[in-house]
């Protein structure tokens, strides 16, 4: 059984493991190889543990009783934006292990993040996605409209990225209804 729920402190290592595995898979030919090799589960676990303690909007796809399945299969995070130029809320992360993709977990995690943002009072949402990430079509499929482009500094390089938005946020909630 798989459930989508708020992250707990005990999930931090599992979230970090998903982060490392998905980045090394999805960004193998996008981000610098040495940067991907340097990703540390223990360092990221501390980062996510801190976020969970602060009550940030971290959600997980957790497996219970699934044979040979890791305890955390995917995760998402969402926060209220300080400046709100692109939207009032940002889906900062959304990652699902390769072996568990195409099962609706990404949609469920994105919906959990959108619901969290509405609870914070956000009326719109956006997500930055690396331009060469094949999953960018997932956001379009769920009604995201490309609204901006730019770069982000990762591993000593400027990496192109694009922003998808749902304004109003109900356009995302309705797609998942």
What function would you assign to each model-found segment?
Residues 126-136, 140-145, 149-177:
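C-terminal "cap" of GNAT-fold acetyltransferases
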Residues 1-3:
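Extreme N-terminal starter segment of soluble prokaryotic enzymes
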Residues 18, 120, 141-142:
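Structural motif
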Residues 105, 122, 144:
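Short phosphate-binding/catalytic loops that engage adenosine nucleotides
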Residues 6-12, 17-101, 107-112, 116, ...:
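Acetyl-CoA-dependent GNAT
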Residues 70, 87, 121, 158-160:
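Residue-level preference for beta-strand/loop junctions
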Residues 117-128:
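Conserved GNAT acetyl-CoA-binding A-motif
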């Amino acid at each position: 059984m798989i459930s989508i729920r708020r992250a707990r402190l005990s999930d931090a290592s599992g979230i970090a493991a998903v982060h490392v595995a998905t980045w090394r898979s999805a960004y193998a030919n996008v981000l610098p190889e040495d940067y991907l090799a340097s990703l540390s589960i223990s360092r990221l676990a501390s980062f996510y543990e801190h976020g969970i303690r602060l009550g940030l909007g971290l959600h997980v796809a957790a497996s219970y009783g699934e044979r040979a399945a890791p305890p955390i299969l995917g995760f998402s995070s969402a926060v209220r934006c300080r400046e709100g130029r692109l939207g009032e809320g940002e889906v900062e992360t959304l990652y699902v292990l390769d072996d568990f993709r195409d099962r609706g977990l990404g949609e469920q995690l994105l919906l959990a993040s959108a619901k969290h943002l509405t609870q914070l009072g956000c009326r719109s949402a956006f997500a930055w996605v690396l331009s060469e990430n094949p999953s960018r079509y997932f956001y379009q499929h769920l009604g995201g409209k490309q609204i901006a482009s730019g770069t982000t500094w990762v591993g000593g390089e400027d990496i192109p990225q694009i922003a998808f938005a749902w304004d109003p946020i109900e356009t995302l909630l309705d797609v998942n209804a």
